[in-house]
């Protein structure tokens, strides 16, 4: 009942990814989604799934999803026109009377999408690794996929296909060549991770950490931990839970899980440990990876001390899959970092931009400042920081705390973007940062225009903030000719 309520109440944005699924019969689909066949050939087959008529291909099954800004039922006719062989709807009136396509009625097309993905996933004998956490999910997913890809054919979700729409669409890409699936799982409320895990059926569950991202929606860090911990509740008895030994909720989660726990951290007692962590040339880090009596040196291809912990989480997940340390090392050293995360790009004007604009939370802001501090060979270090969203009542203090943390790192100039980010400036000034070295702007366009004229050869500029404030616009302007 709780899961059903979640599906009905969730606000979604309609997204789509092209699929290469194996064909499904109409009978299979109707039974999997507990639907009613309204019309069409019951003996026909469908060869793909779509939620967007703009990318729909002939033979697809179109799900009419209702989101915050669009109702897929308005596009049912168009879907059939461009070749949909079937449609899944909750409104019978949305199906044109003259349509030859298969029409299936359900209570909730979003829920039905997940149910069909669950059924489709059950047709394959694959191992699934599920990854969640407040920060580090995407990078950890890419690291896990890089490691496991050395031994198996791996399917992973791409872009932002990590929610109740994107994860099912990713599963429809499964085919007989795949041996392992690596899935990032995002959430904005209780019940969502449980739902995603129930669909994907992971045997390895990774929780990178528990922070205060989305605390506006969940109310407390304890509720966030509960939401992340739903992943463990869906693991099988012989499953493996990968947990951060240095996280404040580690003991609670470890004690609640009855299967095998593989812990990671830089502390003694963890199962997978990073020792002798050191900053290498260019701001990248190296460390000794320890597991029981084995040790191996790892040199990270990505900037940031925090990525050592993402690497540990990925290594622990690989250990749970039976992978040896040499393969883990090779996977970590050769993975490709996700876009807009710790990308250091030199401009034609001679200054560098540290692009970390994908998103922002208090923990990731401080991690980015630490990364900026570790960069050597630059004359002036500048932090351009935007709003952090979904922090609720914690927002004022969280932003001020980032400003306070600025004093622990060698930043010469602070630029804030957005009304909330002005609190970062307040925190910095209160901690002793020079008011003359602070600039505040209302939006990213204004900040970009002003900042570019102030940069000189030898500067390095960190740009970071929540996606809604469009910090990528600043990066675009700074790197333009």
What do these predicted ranges mean?
Residues 2, 16-130, 139-150, 172, ...:
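Short, basic phosphate-binding NTP loop
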Residues 30-32, 90-99, 206-352, 379, ...:
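Acidic, Mg2+-coordinating active-site environments of NTP-dependent enzymes
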Residues 53-64, 172-181, 369-392:
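Mobile, glycine- and charge-enriched loop segments
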Residues 28-31, 96, 111-245, 249-257, ...:
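Phosphate-binding loop of NTP-binding sites
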Residues 212-218, 354, 388-392, 463:
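A short acidic, helix-capping loop that chelates divalent metal ions and anchors anionic groups
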Residues 69, 338, 357-436:
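Active-site beta-alpha connecting loops in nucleotide-dependent enzymes
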Residues 131, 339-343, 460, 468-476:
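ATP-dependent carboxylate/acyl-activation modules
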